[in-house]
Amino acid sequence: MFREVDDFAASVEIVKQVCAENSVTHLFYNYQYEVNERARDVQVERTLRNVVCEGFDDSVILPPGAVMTGNHEMYKVFTPFKNAWLKRLREGVPECVAAPKVRSSGSIDPALSITLNYPRQSFDTAHFPVEEKAAIAQLRQFCQNGAGEYEQQRDFPAVEGTSRLSASLATGGLSPRQCLHRLLAEQPQALDGGAGSVWLNELIWREFYRHLMTYYPSLCKHRPFIAWTDRVQWQSNPTYLKAWQEGKTGYPIVDAAMRQLNSTGWMHNRLRMITASFLVKDLLIDWREGERYFMSQLIDGDLAAN
């Protein structure tokens, strides 16, 4: 089923309309933690007075609120968050729930053709499988053969040492719980600092960003996490910004990274750090310009991580 609306706010009314047209009694959905999306979902539930609405935390392993300080506040530093997260996880690893059987519906066309009105990109989609079966196979292959060596290989962009699962995670093709279960099945010592633990850290970083965004909604509003950085006097230099975007700064690793981004829609994690740092600390260009450009190009674009 596909419905198109003119703007984000209209999505509430269209959900109400679809529910009415199909005599819906229960609505199940997955939580999104961005501030606008959370407000939308609250409004949907208020609008659907006669529909039972149930939300689920599918994009995290432990939901926001599960890992807090002794004062019941959100952690602001990763390492103590990670330690508390691991302690909480050892109490019981959340299970992956099997998908329910599909029930037929005469009013919903399973072969619906959808035309999306935005420019197509010329990226090589072979690197980013959209089928769940292919993503699961890629996950299994990495956990068997790559996760144990990730600590040694992750710092070298020329080496195929990362999982390349970020696009599947960003679009929901894979869940982080699937990643965790496969990792522990192949590398059971990962939870206790053994082989695979460094890649597990990456999953925890992903959790950290989402928990932060939930408890500090200003992060969704182009505000900095560290307050004093809002007083930095950024340079307005369209020439430098364009050179950075096009990979023409004259700094080889920065330029190679940005050209990789522009041609493939993806960039190695270390290169994301290098190019972002160069833009902000060397060119003194507002980080929001970089954030905007990354999100316009990344096939795995993710607001929390970005």
Where are these regions (language model features)?
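Trp/Phe/Arg-rich N-terminal binding region typifying the photolyase-homology
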Residues: 1-93, 195, 259, 305
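Active-site-proximal binding-pocket segments
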Residues: 160-306
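An acidic- and aromatic-residue-enriched active-site/binding cleft used to recognize and process polar
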Residues: 32-34, 58-59, 83, 155, ...
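Glycine/tryptophan-enriched, flexible segments
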Residues: 16, 72-226
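Soluble or luminal CAZymes and related metallo-dependent hydrolases
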Residues: 36, 131, 249, 253
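Glycine-rich loops and low-complexity Gly/Arg-rich segments
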Residues: 26, 52-54, 78-81, 102-105, ...
